[in-house]
Each structure stands twice: as structure tokens, then as C-alpha cells.
Amino acid sequence: MLLKAAPAFALLNTQGENLSPLFSSSKSFSPKNGNRFVVSASKATNHKPLTGVVFEPFEELKKELMLVPAVPDTSLCRQKYSDDCEAAINEQINVEYNNSYVYHAMFAYFDRDNVALKGLAKFFKESSLEEREHAEKLMEFQNKRGGRVKLLSICAPPTEFDHCEKGDALYAMELALCLEKLTNQRLLNLHAVASRSNDVHLADFLESEFLVEQVDAIKKISEYVAQLRRVGQGHGVWQFDQMLLNEGAAA
């Protein structure tokens, strides 16, 4: 109804009487139109803060200054970064380096003169470099959050990838698919650690930099496995290898 005006206004009747004052006003206006109500603005101002709490930065900084470490070997930037997240990041760094080592062994195998599948060699070499970049990206994040990078042992990968039934190309690509799925599961486990620790920075980092890319890699290698199963051994493998050599990209 018209009687319920905004809080910054007061209502006057036709005789100039204030019917429902909401704030004090130094000026009033006389009505000119019959029995209709006239709305008049109020000049009063509410000086109370909206939240009732005044931000005093130097008072709050006193508490934070007590938390700044003075020991030289202690991180200064670390904040809300749990030991579980730090350890899980180091484990994932090891996973990425192991992946890079396996892919590098595959590159060396397919680059042999008696194998000579240059497209597969190129694909696995690029995949090895990409896994190494993933490890370095995790190391940079570890340092950014104030953690300490601890490199773990890397297992020696196999050097032979020939398979009497499947052939070397299909066998190696199936190994790559299993490796990418295993890596995806480890990333999901790392994301679960971040969620349990309420570490939104780590969770966002994994979602934006790793998880989407990992699903894309699994999809692409799955298609490669399906294509190699379809062409069988022989000339079809050479055609597939030429496709990777001219158009392929790393997982």
C-alpha cells in the first residue's frame, strides 16, 4: 500500500500532521492535493557501521606477527597447508617421474633401427616430456605453498615391448592406457586428500591443471588402442604410425 513507504521517508496527512515518522526531519512540506498523502524525505542519517565491527588491521596483525617463523629453514609463505597435502604432492611427483621414465623407454624401443616406428617413437617421447612437465608443475606448487620437495626412487622400466599375440604397437599403447588410468586414480586420491584438509587452493590447482587433461588423455589413447586392434599387425600398424608421425601429439 502507499502507506508503507521506504524507511527514509515520513508520511504526512492533509493537515500536515506526521502519521508515521520513521526518521527526524528538519523540514516538512504542506500537502496541496485534497485528502491524498504526501511523502517527505528525511534528512537524518544513520551513523552506525553496518556490521558493528570496525576493522583494525594493526591490532589483528599483532597476532599474525607472532606466527611468522624466525628459524631460517622454515617456510615464510606457508599457510593452511597440511602435512598430508605436502606428502601427497611428493608422492604424485614420483608418479609423474615414473610415467616419464616408462614413456622414455617406449620411445627408445620404437626408435630402434629394427623397429623403426617413428610415429610411435615421437608420440612416446612427447608423452615423456609432458609427464616431466607435470612433475615440475607439482614441484613449483609445492614450493609456492611452503612445502618441501622430496624426490623418491624411480623404478626401472622394461626395455622390451614386443608381444607375440598383440604386437609391440598395440601392447605398448595398452600399457600407456593403463598407465594413464592409474595416474588419474592417483590424482583423484590426491584431490580427496585436499578435500579432507579443506585445501581449496590444492583442489582448484588439480581441477584446472590436471584432471580435465587426464580424462582427455585417457579418451585419446583409448581410441588409439581401438584403432590398433582394428588394423591388426602388419601394414595397418605402419599406416597408424604414419598418422602419429604427421599428426599425433603427446598424451
Curated annotation (Swiss-Prot):
Record-annotated Ferritin-like diiron domain positions? 79-232
Q: Which domain of life is it from?
A: Eukaryota
Which residues of this UniProt protein bind Fe cation 2?
131, 180, 214
Q: Which residues cross the membrane?
A: none
Q: Which Pfam families match?
A: Ferritin
- Reactions catalysed: 4 Fe(2+) + O2 + 4 H(+) = 4 Fe(3+) + 2 H2O
Q: Does the keyword Transit peptide apply?
A: yes
Q: Please name the PROSITE patterns in this protein's record.
A: FERRITIN_1 (PS00540), FERRITIN_2 (PS00204), FERRITIN_LIKE (PS50905)
MF terms in GO: ferric iron binding; ferrous iron binding; ferroxidase activity
Q: Recorded E.C. number(s)?
A: 1.16.3.1
The entry's Fe cation 1-binding residues are: 96, 131, 134
Q: Which GO terms describe its cellular component?
A: chloroplast; cytoplasm
- GO BP term (any one): iron ion transport
Checking InterPro entries in the record gives: Ferritin, Ferritin-like, Ferritin-like_diiron, Ferritin-like_SF, Ferritin_CS, Ferritin_DPS_dom
Outline where the chain's transit peptide begins and ends: 1-45
Q: Which keywords fit this entry according to its UniProt record?
A: Chloroplast, Iron, Iron storage, Metal-binding, Oxidoreductase, Plastid, Transit peptide
Keyword Membrane included in the entry's annotation: no
Tell me the segments the record calls region Extension peptide (EP). 46-78
Task: Quote the subcellular location field of this record.
Answer: Plastid, Chloroplast
In which family does this protein belong, per the annotation? Belongs to the ferritin family.
Q: Could you give the subunit structure recorded for this chain?
A: Oligomer of 24 subunits. There are two types of subunits: L (light) chain and H (heavy) chain. The major chain can be light or heavy, depending on the species and tissue type. The functional molecule forms a roughly spherical shell with a diameter of 12 nm and contains a central cavity into which the insoluble mineral iron core is deposited.
Function per UniProt: Stores iron in a soluble, non-toxic, readily available form. Important for iron homeostasis. Has ferroxidase activity. Iron is taken up in the ferrous form and deposited as ferric hydroxides after oxidation.
Protein known as: Ferritin-1, chloroplastic
Organism of origin is Nicotiana tabacum (Common tobacco)
